[in-house]
Amino acid sequence: PERPSGARPTQVTKSITNMKATKESKYNALFNKLIDVNDLLNRLIEIAKDLEYPIFRKNDKYPINLNIWGIRSKSTCTKHYNDVIVMFYERDFNIWECMVFEATTDPSNLNLETPVNNKGCAVLREGVHKALWKIGKHKGQYKALVQANPCQVIRDNNRDDKIDITDNTDFGMFGINLHRASSWKVSDEIGLYSAGCQVIKDVNQWNDIIIPLFDKAIGKGTQSYVLINEMDLDL
């Protein structure tokens, strides 16, 4: 996909999943804080410029040149969905579509306390993960974004319910997917749905909005991912 031109958006179109159209979350303070989608998108583009992260823009080859960014909450709670995933693309020159979803970018407390890997839980490292995903099936069950290329994770192996960001890193194919939580209910608690994957809380948003977007934007290609921290936003 095309590298950013450096231009900042002058207008952001409002979508049915922007902050103003979504009820306040009980546990996700970060989600509630991101009221103005236009300001959020401008801030993400500023961060991308400062850190030399890619911002994909519309072009002839990619009419929907999708950007997916995760924002990890500064909260250490891993029981509830307290992070967000932002999906945005340039619909026309400097006219952007921006959608923000409640999510987790961390393993849940249950998986941290009882990791499935003897090295410890995989916590996706913040930064750019180029061509991380492709469309596939999560655990062979339903359409999702599945890991297509190796990535770097942090191994958290002290078996408490808090995320520990250390230098204990690992690199490889770990099944770090982007998928939904429950297929039949929307719960505030992560449960066992994340052992390191990026997980969208709301199955209705997943089925009605996200999967159709993936089909149009990604197809048989790959999708990069940027993960930052709430503190990067300087809110």
Predicted regions and their residues:
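N-terminal compositionally biased, intrinsically disordered segments and leader/signal-like regions
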Residues: 11-18, 23
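Short, positively charged low-complexity motifs
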Residues: 1-14
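Cell wall/extracellular polymer interaction/catalysis modules
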Residues: 20-191, 205-212, 219-223, 230-232
